[in-house]
Amino acid sequence: MKESFYIEGMTCTACSSGIERSLGRKSFVKKIEVSLLNKSANIEFDENQTNLDEIFKLIEKLGYSPKKALTKEKKEFFSPNVKLALAVIFTLFVVYLSMGAMLSPSLLPESLLAIDNHSNFLNACLQLIGALIVMHLGRDFYIQGFKALWHRQPNMSSLIAIGTSAALISSLWQLYLVYTNHYTDQWSYGHYYFESVCVILMFVMVGKRIENVSKDKALDAMQALMKNAPKTALKMQNNQQIEVLVDSIVVGDILKVLPGSAIAVDGEIIEGEGELDESMLSGEALPVYKKVGDKVFSGTFNSHTSFLMKATQNNKNSTLSQIIEMIYNAQSSKAEISRLADKVSSVFVPSVIAISILAFVVWLIIAPKPDFWWNFGIALEVFVSVLVISCPCALGLATPMSILVANQKASSLGLFFKDAKSLEKARLVNTIVFDKTGTLTNGKPVVKSVHSKIELLELLSLALSIEKSSEHVIAKGIVEYAKEHNAPLKEMSGVKVKTGFGISAKTDYQGTKEIIKVGNSEFFNPINTLEIKENGILVFVGRAISEKEDELLGAFVLEDLPKKGVKEHIAQIKNLGINTFLLSGDNRENVQKCAFELGIDGYISNAKPQDKLNKIKELKEKGQIVMMVGDGLNDAPSLAMSDVAVVMAKGSDVSVQAADIVSFNNDIKSVYSAIKLSQATIKNIKENLFWAFCYNSVFIPLACGVLYKANLMLSPAIAGLAMSLSSVSVVLNSQRLRNFKIKDH
C-alpha cells in the first residue's frame, strides 16, 4: 500500500534522513521518501503487517508529528520577522555590555565597566538576562534539538542546542565564581560567553529566516495552482443554476461558467463562447478564444462572457488535479544525486558531536597555559565552535532546493516533471524518438488539393454530407474545406462505418439514390483510376456500381503541417549532439518527406505500436538513453519503454502514468527546454554540493584549532556567522535557477 502524509518538526536533512533510516529498517516498509522542504513523506508498506496509525506511532517516538494534512500553525504572539528583529536588538545589547569597555570605556557607565567584583557581576547579570531573552526567541532550536537527541536522532538543532547550552552553563559557572570570589587569575575573572550564545542564535535565526522565505517563494507555484481550484461550481438543473461542490460533479453535468470565474473541471463548451487565461497550462499570458466544441480545462480563468459547458472529467481526474499531483511528486521525490548527501548526513551530526568532544579533551590537555580555567575556556570555545560551525543544512538543502526552484521555473515554461529523477535524467538523453501526428505536426490535416471527375461543388457536397457525422481528424479537415467553399448539405441514410477504411451512405446523386463512399484506397474496388502525383494523405470519393465495383469520382489530398518552429527546435536538439528518429504509422512518402523537411536523422514508416516498441528496445540495447516524445494517446507502450517519456498534452489527453515530463504548451521547444533545464539544475546541485562539502571539510578543522600556531582561532560567534552564511549561500545559489532562460540559437 502507498500512502502520503505530512511530518512536522523537521529542521534539517538529518531529521528527514533519520526518519527514512529508522523506518527503512522495518521489514514491512518497502520504500520511504521524506521531503524536508515539503514536510511530506511518501511510503510504501505491507498492509498485512501494519497500518498507517502504527507508522505514525513510530514517527512520534522519534520526536516528530505526523499528520494526514498540514494544520495551520498556531498564531504566535510575535511574527517570525518581529522575533528576528528582537533577537538582533537584544544581541546588540549583550554585545554592547560585553565588548563596550574593550572598544571604549566611555561607552559604558562606570557601574558596568567590570573593574571590580560588583560591577562585573552586575554587567554579567544584564548579559544573562539578554541572553535568556534571545534563547527564548530561539527556543525552537532547543525544543527540537534536545528532543531529537533524546530519541538518538541528533540534527542541526541539536548541535546549536548543545553548543550554546554548554557556553551558557560555563558562563553561569564563571558568574558563580565571580559572585563567590573563587576566581584564580585575571583571565578567568568573569570570562563569559553570553554574547557568543546571542550572536550564534541570531545568525542562525537570520539564516533560517532567509532559508524559509526562499522555500516559501519556491513553493508558490504549487500554492498558486491550488488557489486556482474553485471549491464550488454552478450546475444547471431543470433550467436553474445550483451551486454545488466541485467534488460532487460527475461526467456529463452541465455547468455555467460566469465571467471572472475559474473552470471547475475539464469539459467542452456547448453554448456560448469565452476568452480563457490558460497561462497555468502553457505559460502563455495571452487569453485563448474558445467556442462551441472547444475543450476547456480546470484551473483556467474565464475573462469576459459566460458560457455553458459539459463536464468530461470529475475533479479527481481533472487537468489541475493531475498537475498538482505531478508538482507534489516532483518536490517530494529525491534525485539519485542526493543519495550521497543523504548518506553523509546520516552520520554527519553524530560525527561532529564526537569530533567536538575529542577536540575539547585534547585542548584541555595540550592548552599552553598551566591554569585549568584558562585551558577550560579555550577548550570550551573550540567545543562550541566545532558544533556551531558544522552545517548539515548546506548538505541537506543542496539538492532539494535546486529541484524546488527548477520545478517552479519549469511550470512557468508549461513543463511539468513527474519526479526528481525525471528532471535529473533528461540531461543524459542522447537519442530522441518522435511520434509524428500531433507531436511534430498540428494533428489537424488540411486539404491541400482536390482532384475531381465531376463538378467540384458536387464532389464537396457529397464529401461534406457523409463526413460531417465523423469525429475523425481527416474527416474534420474535409468538412472544414467544404464549408469554406459553401458546399450544400445532402440528406443521408444508411450510414455505415468501416473502421480504418472509410464511411458510406445512400444519398441523392444526379437524380438517383446512390451509395456514396469516402475513404482510403483499400475501401474501393475501382473500375477507373485517378492520377495523383502529390505526396499527402489521400481520401477518395466514389460511388458503388455493384457490391464488387466502385467508380471513383474524385480525391482529396490532405497534409498535416508541421507545427510552427519545429524545424528550428529540432536543429537546437541536434546541436546538443542528440540523435533523432521519427516513428509514424503514416505511409513511407509522407514520413520520409516530414523527416527530410525537419532534418530528422532516421525514420520508420507504417509503424504499428509494436514496431515503435521494438525500435526503442533496439536503441536501448545499443546503450542509448532514449527519450520518447508522443501525444500520450496511442503511444503508451513506447512511452513506458523509453528512459524518459515526454507527452505533448492537451489538457485531459495527458497520461500521467506514462509520462515522465508533460508539456502543456504542445510545443517541441519544450523538449529542448526540458533538457537544458535538467542540465542547468544538475550543474546547480553540483555547485551546491561542492560548496557544502568544501565548507565543512575546511571550517571544521579550523574550528578545531589546527591553525592555532598561526594565530588563527575561530570564536563561537564567528562560527555561528559562518554556518549561517553557508546554508544561505546554498539557498541563494539555487535561486539563480529563477533566471534560467532558453536561448533561441
From Swiss-Prot:
Domain HMA: residue ranges: 1-67
Pfam families: E1-E2_ATPase, HMA, Hydrolase
Topology feature Cytoplasmic, residues: 1-83, 145-151, 216-343, 398-685, 736-745
GO cellular component: membrane; plasma membrane
The EC number(s) this enzyme carries: 7.2.2.9
Membrane topology: Multi-pass membrane protein
Keywords: ATP-binding, Cell membrane, Copper, Copper transport, Ion transport, Magnesium, Membrane, Metal-binding, Nucleotide-binding, Phosphoprotein, Translocase, Transmembrane, Transmembrane helix, Transport
Reactions mediated catalytically: Cu(2+)(in) + ATP + H2O = Cu(2+)(out) + ADP + phosphate + H(+)
Chief location of this protein within or outside the cell: membrane
GO biological process: copper ion homeostasis
Keyword Membrane: yes
Extracellular side: 105-124, 173-194, 367-379, 706-716
Domain of life: Bacteria
Subcellular location: Cell membrane
TM segment ranges: 84-104, 125-144, 152-172, 195-215, 344-366, 380-397, 686-705, 717-735
Active site per database record: 435 (4-aspartylphosphate intermediate)
Binding positions for Cu cation per the UniProt entry: 12, 15
Function: Probably involved in copper export.
Family note: Belongs to the cation transport ATPase (P-type) (TC 3.A.3) family. Type IB subfamily.
PANTHER family: ATP7, ISOFORM B (PTHR43520), P-TYPE CU(+) TRANSPORTER (PTHR43520:SF8)
Name the record gives this protein: Copper-transporting ATPase
